[in-house]
Amino acid sequence: MTCKKAFALVALAALAVTFVSWCSAPRQDAPSQAPAATPVADSALRPAPVRLLFAGDMMQHGPQLRAAYDSVRKTYDYSPYFEHIGKLSKEADVAVCNLEVTLRGKPYSGYPQFSSPDEYFKAIAAAGYDVFLTANNHCLDCGRKGLERTIAKLRDAGLAQIGTYEDSLDRVLRYPAVMEVNGHRLSFLNYTYGTNGLKPTAGNVVNYIDTAVIAADVVKARSLGAEFVIACVHWGVENVFEPNQAQRRLAKWLIEKGVDHVIGGHPHVVQPAEVITTPDGRRHLVVYSLGNVISNMKNRGNDGGMLLGMTLGSDNYNDAADGAWWVAFHAPKPRFSGLKNYTAFPAGFPASKMPASEVKALNDFVLDARSVMAKGDSITEKNYENWGW
C-alpha cells in the first residue's frame, strides 16, 4: 500500500523482536543469479537523516467544540486548525503531538473533563501527525472508558500511541516504542507528573514520572536498538514562562541516564531551550515547553505556541542541537479574529491573508515567544518564509 510516511514500529513481544511495517511493498522473488556489484559512494550507503517535528498541547475546550460543529452536516470540522501550519507536519518524517483530551465518545465535554469527538484526532492525523502522546494530567478525565477508547481509536487508525496502556502486559509488549525511520531507530518515551488526583482504574497503566522506571525504560529502548532516545515529559507549572528547578533537575538526570533529547509540555506557554553538554562532548537539546497548539485558555501566552524542528542522523550538523529550529504561531479565538473556527497563523504569515485584528496579535505573540526563548540557549528561529528542514 502507499502512504505518506514510511517507518516501522519495533515491539518486544514475549522474547521475540517483531517488526511491524506501516508501509510495505510487495515481495519480489530473488533472482537466480546475483547481478554484478556496482560501486556505491560512501554517502549513498549512509541512512538518510530523520526530520522530526514536535507540537505542544492539543486542547479541546467547550467553545472549541461549539465552533467546530457543523449543524448542517451534523459533524465536527477541525481542519481550519492546521490550514496554515500543517505543511510542516506533513513534510516531517515523524510528527509528534500531545493529545491532551480523551476520546470517550458522547457526551462530548471541555474543561475540566475533556472528551472530544473522534473527528478531532482524525484532523490532527490528517495534518500529518503520526505519534500521539497520551501520558498527561487529563488522560484519566473519563476513567477507564476514556483511557481505553482513546488507546483503541488511535491504534485502530494506525497511529503510534505512547504513554498510557490497557494493562501491564500491554505496556510490556508496546513500550518503549522504537521506530525505524530512514534506516535509523529512534524511541519516544512519555511520562506525566500526575493525573489531577485521579488514579488509574485497576489494571490500566499511566506512565508517571518515576526515575527507577524511566531508567529501566531507557535501557530497554537501547536493547531494542534505539539509536536516538527522546523523552517527552508532561511537567512544570501552568502559565509560567520559565522552567522550575524540578524540571531542570529531571532534564539533567534524563540526559545522564542516556536520553538524547527532552521535549516538554503542560505549562501551556512557551518555555526556553537548554543545551546540556555531557563529558563525552555530546550536546543534548532540552525544550522545556512548546506551549499550546489550539486552546480556549485565557492567560497571556496560552493562545499559541511553537513548532520545533529537529534533524537526526545528518552529516550536516554535529548533533541535533545544531540542526534544531523553532517557529512561533498564534491561534486567536473566533470572537477576536472574526473567523468561524480557531486557526493558527505562523510567524511571518502574509498580513494580507489574515484578519486585520490578527496582524498585531500575531506580532505581539511572536515578540513574547522570542523574549522567552532568549532566556535560554539559542536555537534557530524560523518563520513562514523560511521554515522547514
What is each of the regions a protein language model found here?
Residues 24-389:
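Acidic, metal/ion-coordinating pockets
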